[in-house]
């Protein structure tokens, strides 16, 4: 699996939302500026995440996007699934001779894939947030809102 720009930017934006006081809404412009993400691209990503129920959108002067659930309830697996990212570590094989010849290798890849997917669904935005804060503290950095 390859982490795409779409996935990377989405996780950065969602972590930014997790940093909002009381998880309140933040505008696309504010998130884009803090995270160095192109605004129009970020808007498309947030629309996709809204349709998947990961964020809520609010209109008006104090509107913007906010997490639909607490950060400890949103996993990396959910985010990637919402973006329709492929989690497949190997090409799809048909029922031909090559599959029979490679069954041992494919079995290992399938087991690794299952463990990988399980790990993605066990890592939450809260985990990433605390990992980032721990790293910053170890580096002697203050609170930094750039993820």
From Swiss-Prot:
Keywords: DNA-binding
GO terms assigned for molecular function: DNA binding; DNA-binding transcription factor activity
Alphabetical list of InterPro entries matching this protein: TR_Rrf2-type_CS (IPR030489), Tscrpt_reg_Rrf2 (IPR000944), WH-like_DNA-bd_sf (IPR036388), WH_DNA-bd_sf (IPR036390)
Organism: Synechocystis sp. (strain ATCC 27184 / PCC 6803 / Kazusa)
GO CC list: cytosol
Matching Gene3D superfamilies: Winged helix-like DNA-binding domain superfamily/Winged helix DNA-binding domain
Gene Ontology biological-process entries: regulation of DNA-templated transcription
Protein name according to UniProt: Putative HTH-type transcriptional regulator slr0846
Domain of life: Bacteria
Domain HTH rrf2-type: 2-130
């Amino acid at each position: 699996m390859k982490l795409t720009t779409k996935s990377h930017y989405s996780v950065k934006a969602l972590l930014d939302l997790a940093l909002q006081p009381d998880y309140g809404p933040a505008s696309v412009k504010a998130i884009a500026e803090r995270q160095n993400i192109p605004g129009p691209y970020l808007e498309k990503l947030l629309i996709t995440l809204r349709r998947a129920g990961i964020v809520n959108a609010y209109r008006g002067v104090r509107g913007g996007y906010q997490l639909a659930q607490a950060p400890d309830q949103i996993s990396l697996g959910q985010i990637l699934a919402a973006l329709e990212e492929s989690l497949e570590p190997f090409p799809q094989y048909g029922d031909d001779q090559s599959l029979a010849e490679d069954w041992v290798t494919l079995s290992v890849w399938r087991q690794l894939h299952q463990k990988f997917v399980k790990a993605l669904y066990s890592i939450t935005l809260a985990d990433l947030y605390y990992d980032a804060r721990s790293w910053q503290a170890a580096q002697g950095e203050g609170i930094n809102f750039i993820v």
